[in-house]
Amino acid sequence: MDPNIARLGEWVGAAKRIVFFGGAGVSTESGIPDFRSTGGLYNQQYKYPPEVIVSHTFYEERPEEFFAFYRKRMLFPAARPNAAHRKLAEWERQGRLAAVVTQNIDGLHQAAGSRNVLELHGSVHRNYCEHCGKAFPLSYILQSTGVPRCDACGGPVRPDVVLYEEALDSDILEAAVEDIAAADLLIIGGTSLVVYPAAGLIRYFQGRHLVLVNKTATAADSRADLVIHDAIGAVFAQLP
């Protein structure tokens, strides 16, 4: 075993309150593309850049085009949890992991069995009518065409995800800050730490060990006590 992975395993074994903070790289091994990696959504060619399409302005002005892109490129109903999701759920069941803070919207942490999941950017599994507030599952979006319409009032149904130009949920952000501040081991995985305010959360960590697991270097590597440049699922599969 890689000595860095072995060291991480030792720290996990000794930790009383682990918090995991993850991004798109956590789900790439489940077949969901990362926005920023080579081959990710930002490097694929569209009429508009993906960050424009998944913006509040684009959603309001071109909802048909938004949903065409959203269904094709943002929804992966066949995706299943990988080794990283499963290991985190296992640690939570053992009482070692306090929370998962995620930038992902795919719901794979919950599918693996995690309960305390703070979804900074919302979830594709929650959708609601903008007029009457009625809730709808992911299947409703997948089975509809064009702009999904509420079966109760006819209003537009939108996903409960944070689009560009929209603010994060303040309650979820506050809970994430509290969990990170109370952690003795913070593991950051599968994120390039460039999207704010989410990336700024690590400054609240005051615990013993900060670990970064990411395929490529991040701006926070120098702050970490341990850095592992590898796929997170491959790393977590080797942990106790």
Regions found by a protein language model. Give the residues of each.
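Conserved catalytic core of sirtuin-type NAD+-dependent deacylases
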Residues: 1-240
